[in-house]
């Protein structure tokens, strides 16, 4: 393999960072992004304060700082126990950094060039492919999003039932 050619997964990770972090149109290289994008953007929104805290102690507005963030991605899988949750945390973190650098074109472009490579190495290409690659990640995200929607719907129906009970009790008390 030519050392100057990046693996397809790296280009796809760059696309995820662009679609999720920079709100660019979904990446043309892989049509499986929608559930992945929904998961990552939801995680970015829900855990924004956590990601902000992670960046608070790093001077990431430099190429050295961006490289430090990439090295920190490698630590996520340092114990050899990769799973989809960790993989998504890495992808979300890279997307969050891209978002934070969106108004600094040179640093953003540098981050989009190097962080996908770090993410690729952190997730581990063999691990990723052995678990179905992008289709496996899409299936995981779809499953988690479906469970979340199910819990939200259960909570919504429970709230509606409670409201109906209260309204019925109020109506009965007026008779």
From Swiss-Prot:
* Membrane-topology descriptor: Single-pass membrane protein
Q: Which domain of life is it from?
A: Viruses
One Gene Ontology cellular component term attached to this UniProt record is:
membrane
Q: Which GO BP terms apply?
A: regulation of apoptotic process; symbiont-mediated suppression of host apoptosis
Enumerate the transmembrane spans. Answer: 153-173
Location of this chain's protein in the cell: Host membrane; Host mitochondrion; Host nucleus, Host nucleolus; Host nucleus
Mutating residue 14 to A: effect?
Complete loss of viral lytic replication
Q: Where is this region: Mediates interaction with human NOP53 and localization to host nucleolus?
A: 37-42
Record key words, sorted: Host membrane, Host mitochondrion, Host nucleus, Host-virus interaction, Inhibition of host apoptosis by viral BCL2-like protein, Membrane, Modulation of host cell apoptosis by virus, Transmembrane, Transmembrane helix
How does this protein assemble? Interacts with human NOP53; may sequester ORF16 in host nucleolus and reduce its antiapoptotic activity. Interacts with ORF55.
Its annotated function is as follows: Plays a role in the protection against apoptosis mediated by cytotoxic cells during the immune response to acute and persistent viral infection. Contributes therefore to latency establishment. Also plays a role in the inhibition of host starvation-induced autophagy which ultimately contributes to the viral chronic infection. Also participates in the viral genome replication within host nucleus.
Q: Which family does it belong to?
A: Belongs to the Bcl-2 family.
Q: What is this protein called?
A: Apoptosis regulator Bcl-2 homolog
Source organism (scientific name): Human herpesvirus 8 type P (isolate GK18)
